[in-house]
Amino acid sequence: MNNQNVDQNEIAKFEALASRWWDPTSEFKPLHDINPLRLNYIDERVSLAGKRALDVGCGGGLLSEGMALRGAHVTGIDMGEAPLSVAKLHGLESGVKVDYRQTTIEELARDPEHAGQYDVVTCLEMLEHVPDPASVIRACASMLKPGGHMFVSTINRNPKSFLFAIVGAEYVLNLLPKGTHEWKKFIRPSEMSDHLRHAGLEVRELTGMTYNPITKVYKLGRDVDVNYLMHARDTRED
């Protein structure tokens, strides 16, 4: 495990909470709240129906199931055994078919049955939890078909994100369990763009995601100071 791009402490955080993944009133409420926004953002740009999609860091399967319900053929990967068990069980209960696997993206990229075979790769709310995000992005890019699309989301690294994403979300509003995030692991959009370009992808769009603590509503917009999504594309001919 030492040579894998995995932080066991990060995995342990989500293992401990896994049984509550599909409870929209639990610690995962923020994920439930933003999932429709993320899903629509992706579907509007690639039209998921009939596409082959890979969800990297799928956790309990919220996004994976959502993409499958939009008609995509989805593979979801994660290194957390408990979240994957929850994802598989929920899929059986809901009748939504997703191929879940316990593996890292770097390992899957070495499998010729998967490398270069996906129209869409998503890596949402995951990159701030791994030791080497650039390695993840390179491996994700290698999974794309020519002309394929990649979507990433994470948290910006600046004083405002420390105030909002850690102090506010974890200690004041109690939206997330304390210790969910480490500020030093947050990734600036400029850094994310560099990672994507070095992986051979063209950045197409940067979009912010904000939370209003009064209305308790998330929305997409231009403010990328805290949470943001980025859309990139493989530049090879389809």
Curated annotation (Swiss-Prot):
What InterPro entries does this protein's entry cite?
Answer: SAM-dependent_MTases_sf (IPR029063), UbiG_MeTrfase (IPR010233)
| GO annotation, biological process | methylation
- What does the record give as the reaction this protein catalyses? a 3-demethylubiquinol + S-adenosyl-L-methionine = a ubiquinol + S-adenosyl-L-homocysteine + H(+); a 3-(all-trans-polyprenyl)benzene-1,2-diol + S-adenosyl-L-methionine = a 2-methoxy-6-(all-trans-polyprenyl)phenol + S-adenosyl-L-homocysteine + H(+)
Pfam families noted in UniProt: Methyltransf_23
| EC number, UniProt record | 2.1.1.222, 2.1.1.64
UniProt key word Nucleotide-binding: no
Q: Which UniProt keywords apply?
A: Methyltransferase, S-adenosyl-L-methionine, Transferase, Ubiquinone biosynthesis
Q: What's a single GO MF annotation on this record?
A: 3-demethylubiquinol 3-O-methyltransferase activity
User: Which biological pathway?
Assistant: Cofactor biosynthesis; ubiquinone biosynthesis
Q: Where does S-adenosyl-L-methionine bind?
A: R38, G57, D78, L124
Q: Which family does it belong to?
A: Belongs to the methyltransferase superfamily. UbiG/COQ3 family.
Please give the HAMAP family that the UniProt record associates with this protein: UbiG
NCBIfam families registered for this protein in UniProt: UbiG
Q: What does this protein do?
A: O-methyltransferase that catalyzes the 2 O-methylation steps in the ubiquinone biosynthetic pathway.
Query: Under which name does UniProt file this protein?
Result: Ubiquinone biosynthesis O-methyltransferase
Give the organism the record lists: Marinobacter nauticus (strain ATCC 700491 / DSM 11845 / VT8) (Marinobacter aquaeolei)
